[in-house]
Swiss-Prot record:
Keywords for this protein: Cytoplasm, Isomerase, Manganese, Metal-binding
Binding site for Mn(2+) 1: D11, D324, H325
InterPro entries documented for this protein: Alkaline_phosphatase_core_sf (IPR017850), DeoB (IPR010045), Metalloenzyme (IPR006124), Phosphopentomutase_DeoB_cap_sf (IPR024052)
Co-factor note (free text): Binds 2 manganese ions.
Reactions it catalyzes: 2-deoxy-alpha-D-ribose 1-phosphate = 2-deoxy-D-ribose 5-phosphate; alpha-D-ribose 1-phosphate = D-ribose 5-phosphate
Gene name, Swiss-Prot/TrEMBL: deoB
Species, as recorded: Clostridium novyi (strain NT)
Keyword Transferase: no
Protein's name according to its UniProt entry: Phosphopentomutase
Length: 390
């Protein structure tokens, strides 16, 4: 009997380049493998005992004789290597067409329309690191009130503003204006509010980031759970990624540790259904900033907290741990990488030491959850429940 699934996404913790990585410029990417190599090994006793080191030969991650979990690596079926594409595929959406990207900034007519609708001028309009662009344009923004608009290798329209210049409520309204404007050929995956604070020369981003995503085009396993009166509890940016669709309750988080805290709080509530958590620091704080050392320490810090999650699990709980894409901090550039993702599953209702090999789509996870709760199957993915359940 399984009453609840705790599904944790370690954002960007990929595990080796996909066969088509050459099309994305990502040959040789291996986020967890290269981070481990960089640090001379990673201490991950909890994930190792679930089977992390048994998925693939990773230098510096312990391979145990008899893991107590089930383990695999997954290919991405969709085109793309971003957060939205990865998470959407997990719950049953195959994004055949990659979301639009803007390496040279957004078209002038689009920006002019945005300025007209918001009543504020735009500065920036280029591909940039969020921390660098507020250093470069923050002072001008504070003086003029113009919005800093920028993008990245991802399909994102990001708006940075100082919280004392553009109050949060206004910034979020501006993002909604952008979201409504960016449709059709310009339907970017996410509009992101990027508030910052501080004085010139020492601006820092705050934790009040908010994502305004496209609404998923059709029902996912989240909707199917919700329709059957099961709880879908979203932790971190999960609610934003799905634009709230299929979510019954949600909590936003400040960082990875807060994400684990909120997950544990939901676990204590003992509601039937799904706790779906995204831990974003790996990607946002360390992957994009090429900080391999901090990335590795972050993996180790999560592993310590994983001990608390395992202790809190009831006999009717199942735990899934995975990732949504890669972001190898040892690679040139600061973009996501097109990688396999690791997968670990554990619970008293599951068999031990099951090697599921390499699976063809992230959607297999969502299809398995649909079967666990006996709800309508999703459009894509093959359930592996029979292979792992006792």
């Amino acid at each position: 009997m399984i009453n609840r699934v705790i599904w944790i996404v370690l954002d960007s913790v990929g595990m080796g380049a996909l066969p088509d990585a050459d099309k994305y410029g990502d040959v040789g990417a291996n986020t967890i493998g290269n981070v481990s190599k960089f640090l001379g090994g990673l201490k991950t006793p909890n994930m190792s005992k679930l089977g992390l080191g048994n998925i693939d030969e990773i230098k510096g991650i312990e391979k145990v004789e008899s893991p107590i979990g089930c383990y695999a690596r997954f290919k991405e079926m969709s085109n793309g290597k971003d957060t939205t594409t990865g998470h959407w595929e997990m719950v049953g959406i195959n994004s055949e067409q990659a979301f639009p990207t803007y390496p040279n900034g957004f078209p002038r007519d689009l920006i002019e329309k945005f300025e007209e609708l918001t009543g504020r001028k735009v500065i920036g309009n280029k591909t940039a690191s969020g921390t660098e662009i507020i250093k470069e344009l923050g002072e001008e923004h504070v003086k003029t009130g113009a919005l800093i608009v920028y993008t990245s290798a991802d399909s994102v329209f990001q708006i940075a503003a100082h919280e004392e210049v553009v109050p949060l409520d206004e910034l979020y309204k501006i993002c909604e204006i952008a979201r409504n404007l960016l449709t059709g050929e310009h339907a970017v995956a996410r509009v992101i509010a990027r508030p910052f604070e501080g004085e010139v020369g020492s601006f820092t981003r705050t934790s009040n980031r908010r994502d305004f995503s496209l609404v998923p085009p059709y029902d996912t396993v989240l909707d199917n759970l919700k329709k059957n009166n099961l709880n879908v509890m979203a932790v971190g940016k999960i609610e934003d990624i799905f634009s709230g669709k299929g979510v019954t309750e949600a909590v936003h988080t400040k960082d990875n540790m807060d994400g684990v805290d909120k997950t544990l709080e939901y676990m204590k509530e003992d509601k039937k259904g799904l706790i779906f958590t995204n831990l974003v620091d790996f990607d946002m704080k360390w992957g994009h900033r090429n900080d391999a050392e901090a990335y590795g320490k972050g993996i180790e810090a999560f592993d310590v907290r994983l001990g608390e999650i395992l202790n809190e699990m009831k006999d009717t709980d199942v735990l899934f741990i995975t990732a949504d894409h890669g972001c190898d901090p040892t690679m040139p550039g600061t973009d996501h990488s097109r990688e396999h993702v690791p997968f670990l599953a554990y619970g008293k209702a599951l068999k031990e030491n099951v090697n599921l090999g390499t699976r063809e789509s992230f959607a297999d996870m969502g299809q398995t959850i649909a079967e666990i709760f006996d709800v309508e199957p999703i459009r894509h993915g093959k359930s592996f429940l029979k292979e792992i359940v006792k």
